[in-house]
């Protein structure tokens, strides 16, 4: 079958499009680099090989010519089309695609309409997708488009078709969901069109599991699982791994696993404490990821008073003393009570002898406490002598930071903030004990149910109103477009929640009872650049808050409308803060609302009718999904203006197209443009490093990277929008080493203290270090980085 398909004649339309793109390359002045030509009447295989040679030849030139980056992306899409099957029914019947029977039936029932929609897509949205760039095209080709036998691959239209059809079917099952999604006439074609337009137009970007498995009889659609089993020894741990963690990992779900109650210190008969369990989890994760499919991961959650905390912090990389305790395939997160930072602040204020006490399982009840109750019980246990060890608070802080910088773990979250701002009063239920793999999901998990979250993000550059070329208008942010996108995303994720199957009974129970949404954003920095705003400017900071507020408002409004139209609120609504008329931002002081009247009306509606979902907004990292949009990741500034990574298949390049186009506009002479790019290259693509401190308003001054912004400003921007992010934000720190290569731990701790004082829930996801040298060493009280996580 492979020989027959790939050796068949390539469709003439594809050949003509390939020739057109190659002509454009010649027009750009690169004809001499195209050493080969297509043979007459080429086969699909010959066209594939030709496109690959052209792209591989021109890829290095993308560093200096953004037009080639776009054309190479268009060529990769032509490579995709060369492998597409024109017969829709072949795709429908493919055993590799394994379409769900319900999805297949819906497509066949509306086949004429769908074929017209796909034809229109080919001549409109698809052209825009093809012009995004090389990384977008490669990500679709290599990861998201399902593969079939004989070298075939599903088309872009078929990809969006299976997602839109799946969502449409489960939306149509509930008339209220359909009525919230579209105004006016409600019918299958109207619902499908709404979803297909949002997906194909890249306004709504589903999470990776939905893109991979949506509409198919394989995989799970949920992204995040939070597990809090009652694990106190190896027997209970093995049971939890086999019954819960194993099935979830095999379904490619990411896990956050609370293990604080496994707190028996090393002793006779138990020589390695919790480290033996962590080694087992590490090996399990490595084995499951060895098949080459979508990798998954585990983050284990511990509080900093755990008896084995120092061993946990030394389990990765060069900090591990030997292979028996090395756990490079999992991450750790410090689930940190306020008391820890209060004591560290006392040390900063000059108090001597401030200690931090470690406890074993005699203090396991501290897991269930937070706030004043935790503080009083912790200090009582100290006074009663139950501690197993005491460490100077600054030494404990140093160990945490050293591990984060040298190994990428631990992450750090603030236990009290996560519990205080939750939508239930947890003093009756017991405290939340952990988050998910990426530190943005806040849910109460216990022995009876897992926390589960289904994710999607809004591509903010698609919410800009862009005036036609050669007109006097300027771009502006369209809040109405964001509001529509938020409502669509709310119904879409609810539909996918209903469509999904879950690996374990406890996971299914968590979905059924909480209906937790995780709606986030991507392309915040890209949107600011398109609006000609520096990310740290007052205008950008104001817009940053307004975006989060509108996202929460319209998502909650859609959820409340579902209940007003007859759907039942989530289980436990009557016991939640929502039933009292409290909204997520009410627990934050001094919040200014841009939509005060809308919130007042919504507050009344929620009290009267309820909320279908219990949670709404989570600012997740969008590492993979933002590659298909060519937007900046999540809410972070870009890490670099030219991403370059060498992989087994060659170099991956992703230039900042907005920067490249700006340089072309201000340096119209080719020699001047190339000189500017050469200067940038020597400065590691730092505009500041290449051209110095440019005046405010200069066309290049806004192109700073994450490492060039004051990290306190980025933390403040997280705090500004925190009242409207009812879950959390995967906030990373971006630190540049000093020229001498010595990075004091106190510098990073000062940022964590700032995040704590600003009331964030996540203090540090990754600590990304831009190295000054490659000769990092560890001396005295200073940290010198030894790895770079770019």
Curated annotation (Swiss-Prot):
Site-annotated residues for Important for hydrogen atom transfer: 224, 453
PROSITE patterns in the record: RIBORED_LARGE (PS00089)
GO terms classed as biological process: deoxyribonucleotide biosynthetic process; DNA replication; release from viral latency
Active-site residues, Swiss-Prot/TrEMBL: 436 (proton acceptor), 438 (cysteine radical intermediate), 440 (proton acceptor)
Catalytic activity, reaction form: a 2'-deoxyribonucleoside 5'-diphosphate + [thioredoxin]-disulfide + H2O = a ribonucleoside 5'-diphosphate + [thioredoxin]-dithiol
SUPFAM superfamilies listed in its UniProt record: PFL-like glycyl radical enzymes (SSF51998)
Regions annotated as coiled coil: none
UniProt family annotation: Belongs to the ribonucleoside diphosphate reductase large chain family.
Protein name: Ribonucleoside-diphosphate reductase large subunit
């Amino acid at each position: 079958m492979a020989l027959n398909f790939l050796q068949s004649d390539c469709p003439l339309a594809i050949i003509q499009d390939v020739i057109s793109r190659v002509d454009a390359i010649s027009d750009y002045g690169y004809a001499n680099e195209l050493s080969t030509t297509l043979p007459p009447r080429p086969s699909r295989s010959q066209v594939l090989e030709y496109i690959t040679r052209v792209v591989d030849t021109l890829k290095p030139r993308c560093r200096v010519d953004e037009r080639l980056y776009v054309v190479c992306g268009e060529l990769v899409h032509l490579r995709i089309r060369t492998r597409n099957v024109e017969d829709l029914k072949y795709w429908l019947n493919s055993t590799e695609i394994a379409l769900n029977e319900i999805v297949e039936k819906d497509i066949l029932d509306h086949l004429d309409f769908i074929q017209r929609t796909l034809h229109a897509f080919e001549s409109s949205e698809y052209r825009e997708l093809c012009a995004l760039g090389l990384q977008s095209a490669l990500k679709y080709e290599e990861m998201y488009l399902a593969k079939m036998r004989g070298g075939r691959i599903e088309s872009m239209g078929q990809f969006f078709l299976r997602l839109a059809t799946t969502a449409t079917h489960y939306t149509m099952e509930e008339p209220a969901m359909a009525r919230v999604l579209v105004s006016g006439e409600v019918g299958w074609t109207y619902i499908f069109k709404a979803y297909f337009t949002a997906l194909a137009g890249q306004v709504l970007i589903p999470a990776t599991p939905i893109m991979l498995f949506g509409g198919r009889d394989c995989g799970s659609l949920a992204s995040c699982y939070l597990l809090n089993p009652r694990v106190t020894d190896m027997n209970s741990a093995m049971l939890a791994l086999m019954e819960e963690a194993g099935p979830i990992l095999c379904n490619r779900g990411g896990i956050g696993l609370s293990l604080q109650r496994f707190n028996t210190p090393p002793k006779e008969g138990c020589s390695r404490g919790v480290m033996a369990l962590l080694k087992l989890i590490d090996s399990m994760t490595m084995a499951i990821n060895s098949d080459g499919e979508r990798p998954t991961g585990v983050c284990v959650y511990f509080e900093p008073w755990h008896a084995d905390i120092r061993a946990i912090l030394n389990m990765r990389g060069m900090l591990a003393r030997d292979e028996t305790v090395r756990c490079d395939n999992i991450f750790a997160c410090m689930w940190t009570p306020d008391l820890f930072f209060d004591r560290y602040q006392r040390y900063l204020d000059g108090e001597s002898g401030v200690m931090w006490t470690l406890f074993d399982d005699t203090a396991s009840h501290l897991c269930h406490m937070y706030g004043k109750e935790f503080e009083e019980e912790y200090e009582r246990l100290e006074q009663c002598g139950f501690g197993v060890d005491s460490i100077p608070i600054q030494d404990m802080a140093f160990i945490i930071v050293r591990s984060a910088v040298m190994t990428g773990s631990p992450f750090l979250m603030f236990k009290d903030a996560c519990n205080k701002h939750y939508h239930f009063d947890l003093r009756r239920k017991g405290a939340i004990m952990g988050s998910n793999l990426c530190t943005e999901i806040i849910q109460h998990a216990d022995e009876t149910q897992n926390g589960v979250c289904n994710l999607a993000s809004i591509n903010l550059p698609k919410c800009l109103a862009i005036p036609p070329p050669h007109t006097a208008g300027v771009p502006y942010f369209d809040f109405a477009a964001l509001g529509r996108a938020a409502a669509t995303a709310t119904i879409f994720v609810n539909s996918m929640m209903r469509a999904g199957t879950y690996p374990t009974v406890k996971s299914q129970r968590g979905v059924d009872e909480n209906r937790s949404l995780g709606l986030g954003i991507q392309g915040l920095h890209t949107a600011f650049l398109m609006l000609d705003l520096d990310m740290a400017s007052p205008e950008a900071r104001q817009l940053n808050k307004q975006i989060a507020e509108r996202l929460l408002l319209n998502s909650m409004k859609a959820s409340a409308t579902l209940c007003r139209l007859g759907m039942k609120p989530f289980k436990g609504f009557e016991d939640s803060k929502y039933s009292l008329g409290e909204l997520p931002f009410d627990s934050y002081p001094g919040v200014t609302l841009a939509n005060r009247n809308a919130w007042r009306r919504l507050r009344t509606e929620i009290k009267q009718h309820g909320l279908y979902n219990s949670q709404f907004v989570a600012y997740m990292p969008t590492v993979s999904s933002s590659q298909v949009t060519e937007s900046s990741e999540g809410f972070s500034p870009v890490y670099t203006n030219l991403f370059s990574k060498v992989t087994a298949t060659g170099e991956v390049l992703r230039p900042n197209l907005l920067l490249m186009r700006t340089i072309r506009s201000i340096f119209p002479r080719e020699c001047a443009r190339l000189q500017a790019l050469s200067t940038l290259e020597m400065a590691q693509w730092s505009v500041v490093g290449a051209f110095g401190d440019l005046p405010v308003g200069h066309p290049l001054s806004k192109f700073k990277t994450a490492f060039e912004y004051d990290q306190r400003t980025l933390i403040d921007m997280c705090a500004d929008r925190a009242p409207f992010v009812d879950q959390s934000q995967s906030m990373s720190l971006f630190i540049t080493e000093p020229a001498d290569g010595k990075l004091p731990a106190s510098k990073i701790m000062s940022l964590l203290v700032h995040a704590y004082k600003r009331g964030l829930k996540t203090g540090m996801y990754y600590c990304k270090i831009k190295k000054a040298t490659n000769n990092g060493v560890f001396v005295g009280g200073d940290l010198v980085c030894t790895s770079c996580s770019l």
